C-alpha cells in the first residue's frame, strides 16, 4: 500500500472507544456468538427524523471506516432526504457471508427484530445496500449474490472486486457456482489512490467481461488512502445511492426491484497511476470510443462526469506528507506499520484527555517542511473509544460498542489529512 500526500494513519494501542451519532434502536442477534466478545453481537438502527416509511436501508458490520461514514452528519442528511436508514452490527458476524454457517438466518431474524422494536415493519422487506471496508469489503458482493431480489446496490469501500482472489480478510473467497450473479444490481468499488494495487482492480474489470449484464462502477478515491472517508467521497456515495433508488424502485410501489438498463449508462476509462496517459472521453455505452475492457459502467452522464472530474482534480499535483507531534515532538513514522505512526497514550491528570498536533514533513518524514499547501491539517477519529473535543484535543469515551471487546477496545485510530490546493494533492 502506498502512503503519502495528505493522509496519515495512527493507531494508539492502549484502551477503548467513542461517542458518535444517534442510533435509536438496538437488538441482540440470536443464534450467533462472537469470537471477539464470547457474546451475541448487537445491531443498531438509525432512521432519519420525520421518516414515515423507509425507502431502503444501508447496512454494515463493524470494522473501521464504516463508523466514520455512518456517523458523518452530512452523509446522514443526504440519506434523510432519500428516506434511507442505517444498520450497524457490532461485532461483525461474517466477513465472507457464508450462508452455510447460518449467517443469513441470523441476519433475517435481526431485521425482523428491528422491525418489531422500531415499528418500521417495512424493514422485513425493504431494499438493502450492503457496505463494507477493507476486511469487511468482500461480504457486500456475496450478500448481493445470495440476496439479489433485496439488494438495491452494493458498495465495497477501499476493498475488493466481486469474486476477487484478494479478499481483504486474507483468506479464500466464496464460490458462486454457475448460475449465481449480481446482474442488474448497481455496484460501486472504491479504491484509494494511496493504497493503489492493480491486482485489486483487475478482477473487477475481468468480472465485467465475465458477467456482461453486471453494473460495476469504480471510483479511484484520489488524494485518499485506506483508512479515511472524505466528505467529497461520501457525497459521491450518496449520489450513487440516489441514482440506484431512482432507477430501481418500482413506480407502482411494488416490491420487485427493477434491473438497471445497462445500455442507458455511460462508460469511463479506469484510473491509472500514470496520470500523463491520455484518457478516453466518457460517453454513452454505445458511443464509447475507448477500450471497453478497460472501462467501468456508470448510471448516466452526471456520474460519469463526476468521476472524471475527480480524477482531473488531483492530476499531476505535487505530494504532501504529514507527521504527528506529541508533547511538542514529532513522532517517528514507520513505513512497515499498517497505521504509519504508533503513539503512546499520554493523558492529562484525568487519565482520559490527550493532545496531538499534525505537521508537514519531507517525503522521508524525517524533517518538517514549509513546502506545502496553505491551511490546517485536520485530525479526526476513525474508530475506537475516543471523542474529539477540539482540533487537537481528544478524550477517551466508551460508546455503543461497549467495554468488553479486547480486540476493539484496545485501539484508537485517528486520521490526519489535508485537502491540498491547486498545486498540492
Describe each PLM feature range:
Residues 1-4:
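Positively charged n-region of N-terminal signal peptides that target proteins for export
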Residues 7-16:
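Bacterial N-terminal signal peptides
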Residues 18-57, 128-143, 147, 151, ...:
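A domain-start/cap signature at the N-terminus of enzymes
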Residues 50-98, 163-164, 197-199:
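Short substrate-entry loop that stabilizes the transition state in hydrolases
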Residues 57-61, 85-90, 127-132, 152-158, ...:
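Structural recognition of the beta-strand scaffold that forms the well-ordered cores
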Residues 97-122:
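Alpha/beta-hydrolase active-site loop
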Residues 153-238:
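The feature captures the conserved acid-bearing segment of alpha/beta-hydrolase catalytic domains
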Residues 222-380:
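Alpha/beta-hydrolase-fold serine-hydrolase catalytic core, especially in secreted/extracellular enzymes
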Amino acid at each position: 500500500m502506498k502512503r503519502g500526500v495528505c493522509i496519515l494513519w495512527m493507531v494508539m494501542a492502549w484502551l477503548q472507544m467513542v461517542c458518535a451519532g444517534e442510533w435509536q434502536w438496538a437488538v441482540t442477534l440470536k443464534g450467533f456468538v462472537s469470537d471477539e466478545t464470547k457474546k451475541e453481537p448487537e445491531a443498531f438502527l438509525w432512521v432519519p427524523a420525520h421518516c414515515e416509511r423507509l425507502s431502503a436501508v444501508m447496512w454494515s458490520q463493524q470494522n473501521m471506516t464504516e463508523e466514520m461514514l455512518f456517523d458523518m452528519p452530512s452523509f446522514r442528511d443526504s440519506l434523510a432526504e432519500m428516506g434511507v436508514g442505517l444498520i450497524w452490527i457490532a461485532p461483525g458476524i461474517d466477513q465472507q457471508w457464508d450462508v452455510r454457517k447460518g449467517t443469513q438466518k441470523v441476519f433475517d431474524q435481526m431485521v425482523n427484530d428491528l422491525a418489531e422494536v422500531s415499528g418500521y415493519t417495512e424493514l422485513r422487506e425493504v431494499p438493502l445496500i450492503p457496505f463494507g471496508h477493507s476486511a469487511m469489503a468482500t461480504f457486500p458482493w456475496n450478500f448481493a449474490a445470495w440476496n439479489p431480489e433485496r439488494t438495491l446496490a452494493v458498495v465495497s469501500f477501499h476493498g475488493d472486486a466481486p469474486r476477487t482472489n484478494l479478499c481483504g480478510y486474507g483468506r479464500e473467497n466464496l464460490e458462486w457456482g454457475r448460475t449465481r450473479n449480481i446482474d442488474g444490481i448497481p455496484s460501486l468499488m472504491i479504491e484509494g489512490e494511496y493504497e493503489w494495487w492493480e491486482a485489486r482492480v483487475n478482477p473487477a474489470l475481468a468480472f465485467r467481461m465475465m458477467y456482461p449484464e453486471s453494473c460495476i462502477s469504480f471510483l479511484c478515491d484520489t488524494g485518499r488512502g485506506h483508512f479515511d472517508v472524505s466528505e467529497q467521497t461520501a457525497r459521491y456515495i450518496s449520489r450513487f445511492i440516489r441514482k440506484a433508488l431512482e432507477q430501481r424502485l418500482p413506480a407502482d410501489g411494488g416490491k420487485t426491484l427493477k434491473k438497471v438498463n445497462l445500455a442507458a449508462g455511460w462508460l469511463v476509462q479506469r484510473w491509472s497511476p500514470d496520470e500523463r496517459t491520455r484518457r478516453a472521453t466518457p460517453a454513452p455505452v454505445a458511443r464509447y470510443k475507448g477500450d471497453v475492457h478497460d472501462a467501468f459502467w456508470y448510471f448516466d452522464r452526471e456520474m460519469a462526469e463526476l468521476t472524471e472530474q475527480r480524477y482531473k482534480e488531483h492530476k499531476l499535483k505535487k505530494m504532501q506528507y504529514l507527521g504527528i507531534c506529541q508533547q511538542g515532538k514529532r513522532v517517528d513514522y514507520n513505513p512497515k506499520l499498517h497505521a504509519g505512526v504508533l503513539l503512546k497514550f499520554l493523558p492529562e491528570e484525568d487519565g482520559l484527555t490527550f493532545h496531538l498536533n499534525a505537521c508537514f514533513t519531507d517525503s522521508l518524514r524525517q524533517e518538517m517542511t514549509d513546502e506545502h499547501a496553505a491551511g490546517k491539517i485536520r485530525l479526526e477519529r476513525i474508530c475506537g473509544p475516543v471523542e474529539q473535543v477540539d482540533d487537537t484535543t481528544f478524550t477517551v469515551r466508551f460508546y455503543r460498542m461497549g467495554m468488553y471487546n479486547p480486540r476493539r477496545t484496545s485501539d484508537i485510530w485517528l486520521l490526519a489529512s489535508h485537502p491540498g490546493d491547486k498545486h498540492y494533492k
